[in-house]
C-alpha cells in the first residue's frame, strides 16, 4: 500500500491499481475492484464496448491513437510476444516497466467516481436504451430517417392510386365536385332557357352528351395526373347563343328543308316557354313547320 496526499487528507490505494500486478491474490483482487469502479459505462446491458474510464484528468476514451513509428514498434512487440490482442501486449509492457512506474510520482486519487460505477450494471433486457457513442448515434440517425423514406413511398402510392383506402376520399371529393358543377350549371340554364333542351337539334344534343360522358369517364379513371389535366371542364357555349340559333332555324325554315321533323312532340313546351323568350312583345314566336304537309299543299 502507498499513501496518497490530496486535499488535506491522506488516502491509500493499492500499488497494483496502477501497475496491474499485485504481490498476492488479495492485492490483485483489490486492483481489479479499483479498476472496475473507474469504468463509466456509456451503453446499457452491461456492454462496455464504448465505455470510458475515470482518470485524474476526467473521463478518457479507452481507444488510443498511436503515431506511425510507435504503432510499428508496438505491433512488432505484439508479434514477438505471440499474442493476438493488443491489450495483452500492453499488460506485458506494464509488468516489464513496473520498476520504472514505481519511481514515478503518485497520482491524486481524490477524484469523484461516477454514480453509474457504484451502482450495479442494468440487466440485459434494457438494451433499448440509446448509447452515446458515435456508432450508436449513427444507428439512431438511420432509424430516425426511416419514416421519411416510408413517407416518400406512401406519396408514390398516392400518385399511382395503389392505396385503395387513401384513394376513396379523393374519388368521393371529385365526384361531389363534378355533381355540384353539373347541378349548378343545370340550375343556371334551366330558368331562362327552359325550351333549349327540347328545341336543340339532335346532332348538337348528341355532341354535348358525348362531351359530358367523356368528362365523367375521365374522372372515373382515378389518376391525379389525368384529373389535373381535365379540370376544370371545357367551357360550355354561353346561353346567349342558343336563342340566336333557334331564331335562325325559325326565321328561315327553307334552309333546313333537308332535315327531318324533330319538334313533333314539343309544341306545348315550346309554346309555354315562348313568352319568356320575347322582349317587349315585338319578337317573332318560335314557329314549327311540318315540311311534309307543306310539300303536299
UniProtKB/Swiss-Prot annotation:
PROSITE patterns: TCP (PS51369). Residues 282-297 have a biased composition (Basic and acidic residues). Its main location: nucleus. One of its GO terms (biological process) is regulation of secondary shoot formation. One of its GO terms (cellular component) is nucleus. InterPro entries: TF_TCP_subgr, Transcription_factor_TCP. Keywords: Activator, Developmental protein, DNA-binding, Nucleus, Transcription, Transcription regulation. Residues 1-22, 116-136, 273-297 are annotated as: Disordered. PANTHER family: TRANSCRIPTION FACTOR PCF8, TRANSCRIPTION FACTOR TCP4-RELATED. Transcription activator. Binds the promoter core sequence 5'-GGNCC-3'. This is Transcription factor PCF8. It comes from Oryza sativa subsp. indica.
Amino acid at each position: 500500500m502507498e499513501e496518497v496526499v490530496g486535499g488535506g487528507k491522506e488516502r491509500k490505494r493499492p500499488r497494483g491499481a496502477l501497475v496491474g500486478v499485485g504481490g498476492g491474490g488479495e492485492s490483485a483482487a483489490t486492483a481489479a475492484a479499483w479498476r472496475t469502479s473507474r469504468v463509466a459505462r456509456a451503453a446499457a446491458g452491461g456492454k462496455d464496448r464504448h465505455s470510458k474510464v475515470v482518470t485524474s484528468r476526467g473521463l478518457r476514451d479507452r481507444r488510443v491513437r498511436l503515431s506511425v513509428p510507435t504503432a510499428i514498434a508496438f505491433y512488432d512487440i505484439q508479434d514477438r510476444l505471440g499474442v493476438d490482442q493488443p491489450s495483452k501486449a500492453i499488460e506485458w509492457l506494464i509488468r516489464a516497466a513496473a520498476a520504472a512506474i514505481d519511481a514515478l510520482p503518485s497520482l491524486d486519487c481524490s477524484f469523484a467516481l461516477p454514480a453509474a460505477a457504484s451502482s450495479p450494471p442494468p440487466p440485459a433486457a434494457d438494451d433499448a436504451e440509446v448509447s452515446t457513442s458515435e456508432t450508436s448515434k449513427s444507428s439512431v440517425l438511420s432509424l430516425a430517417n426511416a419514416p421519411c423514406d416510408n413517407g416518400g413511398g406512401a406519396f408514390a402510392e398516392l400518385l399511382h392510386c395503389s392505396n385503395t383506402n387513401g384513394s376513396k376520399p379523393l374519388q368521393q371529393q371529385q365526384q361531389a365536385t363534378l355533381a355540384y358543377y353539373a347541378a349548378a350549371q343545370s340550375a343556371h340554364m334551366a330558368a331562362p332557357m327552359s325550351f333549349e333542351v327540347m328545341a336543340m337539334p339532335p346532332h348538337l344534343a348528341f355532341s354535348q352528351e358525348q362531351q359530358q360522358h367523356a368528362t365523367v369517364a375521365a374522372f372515373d379513371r382515378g389518376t391525379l395526373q389525368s384529373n389535373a389535366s381535365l379540370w376544370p371542364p371545357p367551357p360550355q357555349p354561353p346561353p346567349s347563343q342558343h336563342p340566336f340559333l333557334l331564331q335562325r332555324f325559325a326565321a328561315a325554315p327553307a334552309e333546313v328543308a333537308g332535315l327531318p321533323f324533330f319538334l313533333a312532340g314539343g309544341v306545348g313546351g315550346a309554346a309555354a316557354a315562348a313568352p319568356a323568350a320575347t322582349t317587349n312583345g315585338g319578337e317573332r314566336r318560335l314557329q314549327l313547320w311540318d315540311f311534309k304537309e307543306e310539300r303536299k299543299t
